[in-house]
Design a protein with these regions (language model features):
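Non-cytosolic head/periplasmic domains of membrane-anchored proteins
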Residues: 92-194
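Anionic-ligand-binding alpha/beta catalytic cores of soluble enzymes and soluble regulatory domains
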Residues: 250-258, 269
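Hydrophobic beta-strand positions that form the internal "hydrophobic ladder"
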Residues: 62, 99, 137-139, 180-184, ...
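Repeated scaffold domains used in trafficking and secretory/extracellular systems
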Residues: 48-57, 86-97, 125-134, 168-178, ...
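N-terminal Lys/Arg-rich, disordered targeting/topogenic segments
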Residues: 1-11
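Surface-exposed loop/turn elements that mediate protein-protein interactions on large endomembrane-trafficking
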Residues: 25-46, 67-84, 106-122, 149-165, ...
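Hydrophobic membrane-insertion alpha-helices, especially the h-region
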Residues: 12-30
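An edge-strand/N-cap motif at the start of beta-rich repeat modules
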Residues: 37-47, 52-63
């Protein structure tokens, strides 16, 4: 009889262990989108998400958006805010303290700040793209019946400020100036002979343009700088080199990568005056680039490098995982983005 009682106790003990394991497994599954602290490594933290996630940086933080909404984490892995909203094909654009969320093909666009909704705007037709500036003004590009595209400028309160319907040109991109007085539109106009691309600067309030904000734009054969009056300030000709990637810096340098002769890439760095300041030749084709102040991040197949504006290598980090995108954070920390995860790396 005593042995039977002992076996019963042992069976109960094992049952409790199994229940605990199931609970722990369920907890891990429920928190599969949270952060893991990694010790003894150059990785500061890792964030694993579900499918269809995209990542961006904002004020030194990492913002992730997916089908369940958006989240913001500090570079130490601390969650700062969370927006719960159902998305199918989400897009986001971050500037200053603002986050602009929308779905390509839907009509709604949302502006948030620190996880709180500021305004919501509904366009008449499906949205193609949208941009926000640091004051909460947005440029929303959408389709339009009877036209090729429409650009709507939305102010910081969510009200329609300006509308431009285009009958001859397709709109590739649009952006509002930092002072909210002008917006720039990149358009293409196809005809029987060729396709013409142009950048148009529009004065929103009709006042005389007094600002000196310059606009940088990349075409198929050159990098150009244009004044708000549409005057060419400088141009960099690509001289038949094959452009691979580019990153236009805000109040800093511009970087371009071209196809090399050994299945590699050549990165060229240009200052705000259009003068070349440096060059970096990679061992393999460059997958992605980013710039923050005086530091440039270069992603190759299995290596991540930080270089200066003169092209000098500052640090190199060997990658053990597949990284598709890099984003520079303060203190030269790097957000390395995979298919559905992001890791903050300190070289």
């Amino acid at each position: 009889m005593g042995r039977v009682k002992k076996n019963k106790n042992k069976s109960a003990y094992y049952a409790v262990i199994i229940i605990i394991i199931i609970i722990l497994a369920f907890a891990v599954y429920q928190n599969r989108g949270t952060l893991r602290a990694l010790n003894g490594s150059s990785e500061v933290f890792s964030y694993e998400s579900g499918q269809n996630f995209s990542f961006d940086t904002q004020n030194g933080n990492v913002v992730a958006i997916g089908s369940d909404g958006a989240q913001c984490f500090s570079d130490k892995g601390i969650r700062k805010w969370n927006v719960i909203r159902r998305f199918v094909n989400p897009r986001m654009q971050n500037e200053g303290d603002f986050n602009l969320f929308y779905e390509k093909g839907n009509k709604e666009v949302y502006l948030y700040s620190d996880g709180s909704k500021i305004w919501e705007y509904v366009s008449d037709q499906p949205i193609i793209t949208a941009k926000i500036n640091a004051k909460g003004y947005a440029a929303v590009v959408s389709y339009e019946t009877g036209y090729r595209a429409k650009i709507e400028i939305i102010d910081g309160l969510g009200s329609l400020l300006y509308k431009w319907q285009l009958s001859e040109d397709y709109v590739i991109d649009a952006d509002v100036s930092p002072d909210c007085k002008q917006f720039a539109a990149a358009t293409v106009s196809p005809n029987d002979a060729n396709v013409t691309s142009r950048v148009t600067v529009v004065d929103i309030d009709g006042e005389k343009i007094t600002g000196e904000t310059l606009l940088a734009a990349v075409g198929s054969d050159k990098l150009v700088c244009i004044s708000p009056r549409g005057e060419m300030q400088w141009a960099v000709d690509f001289e038949e080199k094959q452009l691979q990637k580019f990153k236009l810096g805000y109040n800093t340098s511009h970087i371009l990568t071209f196809e090399g002769s050994r299945n590699n890439s050549i990165l060229e760095i240009y200052g705000k005056d259009g003068k070349k300041t440096g060059e970096y030749i990679s061992g393999e084709e460059i997958k992605d680039i980013d710039i923050n102040g005086a530091t440039i991040a270069v992603l190759e197949k299995q290596e991540l490098s930080l270089i200066s504006l003169k092209g000098a290598v500052m640090s190199e980090t060997e990658l053990k995982k597949d990284v598709k995108k890099v984003m520079l954070l303060p203190k030269n920390r790097i957000a390395a983005v995979g298919s559905s995860s992001v890791e903050i790396i300190k070289p």
